[in-house]
Each structure stands twice: as structure tokens, then as C-alpha cells.
Amino acid sequence: MKLNISYPVNGSQKTFEIDDEHRIRVFFDKRIGQEVDGEAVGDEFKGYVFKISGGNDKQGFPMKQGVLLPTRIKLLLTKNVSCYRPRRDGERKRKSVRGAIVGPDLAVLALVIVKKGEQELEGLTDTTVPKRLGPKRANNIRKFFGLSKEDDVRDFVIRREVTKGEKTYTKAPKIQRLVTPQRLQRKRHQRALKVRNAQAQREAAAEYAQLLAKRLSERKAEKAEIRKRRASSLKA
């Protein structure tokens, strides 16, 4: 069985192949999310604590959290669930998934280091994998570099070098939610537009109410005139 161990602190991961079944027996009958002491796997993992995060069986079917079985099962899967990505809106599909209980039929078991042990693991805990991209949002850039609101975040955005043919240039992401004079001007303009539209609507409503009152008074006067004529004709 292969153990795909990740170390989120350094952003690194490494696969260890273990042929001796007695060493991996400690994982059997454990579920996704449970923690396991690494000393039972080998002396190099002494002091380490691993959390089971997933895996695949020998046919490539992924383990699914919440399925309390050590075998494969077919489930009707929908949007926003693991092991399935719908291609159309509202699409559902019955797919085979492996249960969340670890067994000997697994080819790869994914583990996360929760607690670091005594000695370093070569290529895993002794190396740091830098993030390829830096923060993009203005507030996150400020938080990342410890800037105040007065500092210009555009000077601190992380640029990366790109080589195209013989030409080398730098690229930087577009800073999101950056407050600039243009943005404030646009906001003021939109607010003024809103106020202007509301004022125009109020004026139009007042004009309509005035016209309606005029029409109603005219109709009332007409009806009163008709009643007066009718009363005078009856008297005659």
C-alpha cells in the first residue's frame, strides 16, 4: 500500500510505499477523520500522529466520507458532494464509491501530519514548498505585509517572472477591492444618480397625484351638474 502523507505547515507531500502488511495493519478498521499513532508504521515515524483524510482502492474508486462501509457501494450523487462533479444544472448520477473504513483492498491511503515526531522525514518535513501566487485582495495584502491603511498596496503585490521565448517579464494579479480615487468618484456619481432618480420619481408621483385630484374634482363637478339638471327637469 502507498501512504500519501502531506504536511500542511510546509505545504509539502510525499508518497511512501510500504510492502509489509503488518506495518499498515494499524490503519485497518479506522475511518476517515480518525487519528493514528505513526510509531506502529515504522521507527522513522516515531512521535508522529497521522489523520486519515481519504484514499483509493485498487480499481481507483475514491473513499467517501460518511459511508460507513469497508466495501464499494453505488450512490446517487448530486451537486456539492464529494466524488462527483455534475456537467449540467440539476444533474444527478449513480456512481461507485469506496466506503470510509480502511481495509486491505486500498492501493493508496492519504494521511495528514497532525503532530510532528522526533526526526525529520526527508523530502516532507525538511522542505518548504513556497506558494506560487501571493494574496490578491487588498485587505489580504495588507494583512500579509502588516501594512496600514495609508500604505499603497500596489507597491507590495507579489510579482512573478514569466519567460516567453527570449523575453522575460513580470506579471502581477489585478488587486481586488482596491479603493482608488476613481472608485470613490464612481461611487459618488452612482449615489448622486440614485438621489436624482429618487427626486425625479417623487416629483413625477406628486405631479400624477395633482393631475388625479384635478380629474376627480372635474368628474365630481360633472356628476353634480347632471344631478342638478335631472332634479330641475323633474320639478318642471
Swiss-Prot record:
**Name the UniProt record assigns to this protein:** Small ribosomal subunit protein eS6A
GO CC annotation: 90S preribosome; cytosol; cytosolic small ribosomal subunit; nucleolus; nucleoplasm; small-subunit processome
Q: Output the PROSITE patterns linked to this UniProt entry.
A: RIBOSOMAL_S6E
PANTHER family annotated for this entry? 40S RIBOSOMAL PROTEIN S6
Extra information: Present with 66000 molecules/cell in log phase SD medium.
Give any GO molecular function from the UniProt entry: structural constituent of ribosome
User: Is-annotated flag, keyword Repressor?
Assistant: no
Disulfide topology: none
- Family recorded in the similarity comment: Belongs to the eukaryotic ribosomal protein eS6 family.
Crosslink feature (Glycyl lysine isopeptide (Lys-Gly) (interchain with G-Cter in ubiquitin)) location: K116, K131, K149, K214
- Superkingdom classification of source: Eukaryota
User: Assembly and interactions?
Assistant: Component of the small ribosomal subunit (SSU). Mature yeast ribosomes consist of a small (40S) and a large (60S) subunit. The 40S small subunit contains 1 molecule of ribosomal RNA (18S rRNA) and 33 different proteins (encoded by 57 genes). The large 60S subunit contains 3 rRNA molecules (25S, 5.8S and 5S rRNA) and 46 different proteins (encoded by 81 genes). Interacts with snoRNA U3. uS11 interacts with MPP10. Component of the ribosomal small subunit (SSU) processome composed of at least 40 protein subunits and snoRNA U3.
- What is the annotated localization of this protein? Cytoplasm; Nucleus, Nucleolus
Gene Ontology BP term (one)? maturation of SSU-rRNA from tricistronic rRNA transcript (SSU-rRNA, 5.8S rRNA, LSU-rRNA)
Keywords for this entry?
Cytoplasm, Isopeptide bond, Nucleus, Phosphoprotein, Ribonucleoprotein, Ribosomal protein, Ribosome biogenesis, rRNA processing, Ubl conjugation
| Phosphothreonine carried by residues | T163
Briefly state the protein's biological role.
Answer: Component of the ribosome, a large ribonucleoprotein complex responsible for the synthesis of proteins in the cell. The small ribosomal subunit (SSU) binds messenger RNAs (mRNAs) and translates the encoded message by selecting cognate aminoacyl-transfer RNA (tRNA) molecules. The large subunit (LSU) contains the ribosomal catalytic site termed the peptidyl transferase center (PTC), which catalyzes the formation of peptide bonds, thereby polymerizing the amino acids delivered by tRNAs into a polypeptide chain.
